[in-house]
Amino acid sequence: MFRAFGHDDVAVLDGGLPKWRAEGRPVTTDTPAPATVDFSATLRTDLLRSADQVNANIASGGEQVVDARGAGRYNGTEPETRPGLRSGHIPGSMNVPYAKIIQDGAMVDGVSLTQAFEAGNVDLAEPITTSCGSGITACILALGLYLVGRDDVAIYDGSWTEWGGREDLPVEK
């Protein structure tokens, strides 16, 4: 999401603090004193999708929509975590559960990333929009895709919370 607001110089601590500590790396309890800087956000609308854009894409098929939720929620066989949401998925979308690209809290290697997306029938050469339950784990898929060379992946940040809550949008099971 940093990139969606024009901040391209971003790093992710792969595996987080638990992996850092497990590797015996130094930590401190000192409070940092970062320098104050000005940042002017520039919204990159090419990296975001609205419900209307995703809905129009169902007919056009111009982009692959890849859902990061687990298979049960995607297929509509497990209940949604938010009350009142319909079950299922965006018509024509594919399912690559984000847990397939994370191992022990860290991103899997590049070969395994590619294999996970290909196993979900994602064509890595075609346009991609990621979705999930609320826009958070869609970012994990987008990061994984970035790591295999796709720096143009869009995120549907409304995701299933918006889609499943709107009766005017179609659902597949």
Give the location of each predicted region:
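Thiolate-centered catalytic microenvironments shared by cysteine-dependent enzyme domains
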Residues: 1-60, 77, 137-159
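Structural recognition of the beta-strand scaffold that forms the well-ordered cores
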Residues: 64-67, 129-131, 154-155
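Positively charged, proline/Ser/Thr-rich regional signature most characteristic
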Residues: 50, 55-125, 165, 169-173
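Short acidic capping loops at alpha-helix termini that bridge into adjacent secondary structure
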Residues: 9, 91-92, 124-127, 151-152
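Residue-level detector of flexible, active-site-proximal loop/helix-junction positions
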Residues: 17, 34, 72, 100-102, ...
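Extended hydrophobic/aromatic segments used for targeting, binding, or gating
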Residues: 151-173
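A phosphate-binding catalytic loop at a beta-strand-loop-alpha-helix junction
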Residues: 128-140
